Amino acid sequence: MDNTNKNINQNANTNENKKINNKRGSEYKEQLEKLKDKNYIKKLEKQGIKVVSVNDRDYPAKLLPYDHRPEYLFYKGRLPDRDKPVVAMVGARACSNYGRKMARALARELSENGVQIISGMARGIDTYSQIGALEGGTPTFAVLGSGVDVCYPTENIELYNDILKNGGIISEYPPGAGPIAWHFPLRNRIISGLSDKVIVVEAREKSG
């Protein structure tokens, strides 16, 4: 393929990506507009879903310094205790058996010592980190790439429910939002932003 055709294809892809991103942005804004409706808020509360804005007292203080912090956070259960340490544990979905064991053991030990573990409830390292955190007894928190009422991956529904017993499920995406691919890299900034330290248990060299 000559350079002219390459440039045409690159421009076409760029324009298409812009259209997709604009559509996603407008859909997100439409959802957030609903937050001005008190009846909508009451409906969420009946579903056990709470909303906190960047202007609210309960908004996580750790996120405030960041320019790209989410304007709103939706959550079920509760938010991390700001007076206790928070450690994020993340890593590969397709991880080794050794990685799973280490994630679970380390999370359990940290949790036994009063450290709140936060992760993304994804397959692999995230899942085993949160299982270990539950075994340690200190509340753990999951930041999802979907709405807080959408358990993803679906096979983690038991883990999802166990986290809610003492901890919380958090998302910047409105209830009902599906697990769209572009949500996940963005939610990572919330995981790291809420944490005092981040532990990458196992990951490929160019992992997200």
Per-range role (PLM):
Residues M1-R57:
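Short, small/acidic-rich helices and loops at N termini and domain boundaries
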Residues N3, E45-G208:
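Glycine-biased, small-residue-rich flexible motifs in mid-sequence functional cores and linkers
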